[in-house]
């Protein structure tokens, strides 16, 4: 009996391991429009979901640049995991210093596609191999496109097109540099940050991000 249960459990584990790889291959097709686990949950609970897919060509470049500079400035140069940044995080943790994030845009994308929210060493451990696989399967441009279309920008607001229309009454293609920067700095905490009504601290960070986005040319070539 125990032998058969173990065999079934192993089969389930194999399927769970293979499924994300298969889905990433499917998501490499440009006409496929993935959804996040949060969106699936909202659909299952019959909660409202505001998401309008938009191709990356129809997103203002300043928004793409702002998100990259705010979330993952080395997006075009690492392989899905920023090992240098991760090393700095581990050093800080060992020294008892303040915590900092090491999640890349690729890691955030796979988390949104396949995993759950909340702090968890297990989830973080799963992000690493999934991000490496995603980087091998998908182009950087496709990774950015998927991320911008599944990221949460507020309760029930998914994707940059829905966010741009909800907060600024315009399409993602027509966002200004200031609006793009405010949307970018909203991403780490969309439940508490409102880009249409930014706090002074949000405005300060947005100005920094906007400045970096203006000088981001050498860092954003992979999404052009």
UniProtKB/Swiss-Prot annotation:
Topological relation to the membrane, as annotated: Single-pass membrane protein
Catalytic activity: [GlcNAc-(1->4)-Mur2Ac(oyl-L-Ala-gamma-D-Glu-L-Lys-D-Ala-D-Ala)](n)-di-trans,octa-cis-undecaprenyl diphosphate + beta-D-GlcNAc-(1->4)-Mur2Ac(oyl-L-Ala-gamma-D-Glu-L-Lys-D-Ala-D-Ala)-di-trans,octa-cis-undecaprenyl diphosphate = [GlcNAc-(1->4)-Mur2Ac(oyl-L-Ala-gamma-D-Glu-L-Lys-D-Ala-D-Ala)](n+1)-di-trans,octa-cis-undecaprenyl diphosphate + di-trans,octa-cis-undecaprenyl diphosphate + H(+)
Alphabetized InterPro entries for the sequence: Glyco_trans_51, Lysozyme-like_dom_sf, PBP_transglycosylase, Pep_trsgly
Major location category of this protein: membrane
GO cellular component: peptidoglycan-based cell wall; plasma membrane
One GO MF term attached to the UniProt entry: peptidoglycan glycosyltransferase activity
TM regions (residue ranges): 12-32
Pathway it works in: Cell wall biogenesis; peptidoglycan biosynthesis
Assigned keywords, A-Z: Cell inner membrane, Cell membrane, Cell shape, Cell wall biogenesis/degradation, Glycosyltransferase, Membrane, Peptidoglycan synthesis, Transferase, Transmembrane, Transmembrane helix
Tree of life domain: Bacteria
Compartments reported by the entry: Cell inner membrane
GO biological process annotation, one example: cell wall organization
Enzyme class: transferase
E.C. no: 2.4.99.28
HAMAP family found in the cross-reference section: PGT_MtgA
Function text: Peptidoglycan polymerase that catalyzes glycan chain elongation from lipid-linked precursors.
Family: Belongs to the glycosyltransferase 51 family.
Protein name, as recorded: Biosynthetic peptidoglycan transglycosylase
Source organism of the structure: Brucella melitensis biotype 1 (strain ATCC 23456 / CCUG 17765 / NCTC 10094 / 16M)
UniProt lineage: Bacteria, Pseudomonadati, Pseudomonadota, Alphaproteobacteria, Hyphomicrobiales
Gene: mtgA
């Amino acid at each position: 009996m125990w032998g058969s249960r173990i065999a079934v459990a192993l089969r389930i584990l194999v399927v769970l391991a293979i499924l994300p790889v298969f889905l990433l291959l499917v998501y490499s097709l440009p006409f496929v429009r993935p959804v996040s686990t949060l969106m699936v949950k909202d659909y299952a609970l019959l909660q409202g979901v505001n998401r309008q897919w938009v191709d990356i060509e129809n997103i203002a470049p300043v928004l793409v640049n702002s998100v990259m500079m705010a979330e993952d400035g080395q997006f075009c140069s690492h392989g899905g995991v920023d090992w240098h940044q991760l090393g700095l995080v581990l050093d800080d943790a060992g020294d008892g210093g303040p915590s900092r994030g090491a999640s890349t845009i690729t890691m955030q994308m796979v988390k949104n596609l396949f995993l759950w929210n909340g702090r968890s060493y297990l989830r973080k451990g799963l992000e690493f191999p999934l991000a490496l696989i995603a980087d091998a399967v998908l182009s950087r441009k496709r990774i950015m496109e998927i991320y911008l279309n599944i990221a949460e920008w507020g309760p029930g607001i998914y994707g940059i097109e829905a966010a741009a229309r909800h907060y600024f009454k315009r399409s993602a293609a027509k966002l200004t540099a200031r609006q793009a920067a405010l949307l970018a700095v909203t991403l780490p905490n969309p439940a508490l940050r409102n880009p249409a009504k930014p706090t002074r601290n949000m405005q300060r960070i947005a100005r920094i991000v906007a400045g970096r986005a203006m000088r981001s040319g050498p860092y954003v070539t992979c999404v052009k």
